[in-house]
């Protein structure tokens, strides 16, 4: 992890494209974008077909419109969300407020965890509907249907990795906050430092003073 709050460099640095593209969450997010693009493109392109006795288009997944709607919806939203968080990753190091960084990382964590679950549901749903589809009802789009199912399966892992990376950044930010703002507990075994001994300074007679000598006895007055 880079130094700084929530896994990013301190604010104020210049943007480094090579360093940005080498970040694990950026690479995984780009992969997730490509997978989502393939899924909804397959459904939009060849996810609807007609049967022999009708010209009306039906969803290729067992003629279940909900299957096509669900697969295309999570694919489009996953693509848009990946693009949004990719922009956030690009400008994340320019955000100086640690609270704003925390909320963005939490949003990334929650969304990635939710979409991991939704991709799992989508994979199971599409697989179930495809298994129930009659081969004679599929004139075109069989390969696209299989591709949508396959890349839905891969999306489960890509979004799971994104959730894990977001959690690591969140934990790094919390640990840094604790180290910086919580006073450490003193060690009872550590001896207290001794106070320096007071130095005794010799008394010095102040300047511009005369010694007053006192003599005992009578002194005769001067004779003129």
Curated annotation (Swiss-Prot):
Residue ranges annotated for the MARVEL domain, each copy included: 20-171
Keywords: Acetylation, Cytoplasmic vesicle, Membrane, Phosphoprotein, Synapse, Transmembrane, Transmembrane helix
Keyword check for Transmembrane: yes
Membrane topology per record: Multi-pass membrane protein
Intracellular or extracellular location(s): Cytoplasmic vesicle membrane; Cytoplasmic vesicle, Secretory vesicle, Synaptic vesicle membrane
Any one of the GO CC terms: synaptic vesicle membrane
Transmembrane segments: 31-51, 72-92, 105-125, 147-167
Pfam family, one: MARVEL
Phosphoserine modifications at: 3
GO biological process: protein targeting; regulated exocytosis; synaptic vesicle membrane organization
Modified residues annotated as N-acetylmethionine in this record: 1
InterPro entries in alphabetical order: Marvel, Synaptogyrin
Post-translational modification: May be tyrosine phosphorylated by Src.
Biological function: May play a role in regulated exocytosis. In neuronal cells, modulates the localization of synaptophysin/SYP into synaptic-like microvesicles and may therefore play a role in the formation and/or the maturation of this vesicles. May also play a role in GLUT4 storage and transport to the plasma membrane.
Family designation: Belongs to the synaptogyrin family.
Protein name: Synaptogyrin-2
Organism field: Mus musculus (Mouse)
Gene this protein is translated from: Syngr2
